[in-house]
Amino acid sequence: KVIGINSQIITQNGGNAGIGFAVPVNTAKAIVPTLIKGEKFLYPWIGISGMNLSKNHKKALELEENMDGVMIVDVMIGGPAEKSELKGYQETISDNYNSYPSGGDIILSINEIPISSMNELSSVLFENHSSGETISLSILRDLEKIKVDLELEPRPQ
């Protein structure tokens, strides 16, 4: 069973033993057909930077402990998220030990697929969606769940 494709090896003596880097097979499956056609693969992009919600961050925001999502930290100017009026964090809150971003939208799901981390958000976009496609985001804004449509764009180079 193929799990990845070797792409590079770091070695001290020029041999094939050392630290290897591989492209995951799901990534290759998504990209290779486009490349075979002689086309450039356009990664779908929503135009945010975000952060995972830790247990303490959720507590500081007064969210349920079992609620997962990605807090939008920053919205890229002119990007899809800005066009869809998504909001990055506005202020910080403290739990007497740490400060946490607050006031930003929290992405809960993409087309009903739950999102619990930035890594998962990237994977869901990459494996299931294309640039130019419109997706439906479930967002938590000011403790209220709302739906926001967003048209994916190609990730800037």
Which positions does each model-derived feature cover?
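Active-site loop architecture of trypsin-fold serine endopeptidases
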Residues: 1-36
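C-terminal recognition in membrane/secretory proteostasis and scaffolding
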Residues: 14, 27-157
